[in-house]
């Protein structure tokens, strides 16, 4: 078609380049100075209900960290609060990029958030758990080696993926230990 085009950048990369670690983020959100583990449980209630309890089970093992959950717009705070069992868990809305910018590590639901987390250079564990029947059907229809965008783009396991039965407290703790000690 011979159109004249000019590449001017990507809005996500522009947004990320403007983020800096900020003590004001801690103060405004009533967070302590303890390091943050970001938790991105997804945007649909059904996926949050399945994954968030496992994700937040890590808080008891890491009392010197704050687990900060990036809450999805449109889901009321009370829905998230049913999952709070530890003192070091906080829920924030509309601050996903600020959470990532200030995180030492992240536990992330498979999807666009995995790529965003990687662009912030935050070590992550990618989590996916759905209904068994949906998972089995998808495995038959879709033939991919990985579920995270990071791994798909790189065609290599750059970030650890915990899928279905592998997403459990024991495995997640093992992988988070590796991230936090490397």
Predicted features along the sequence, with ranges:
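Nucleotide-activated sugar donor-binding and catalytic core shared by glycosyltransferases
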Residues: 1-182
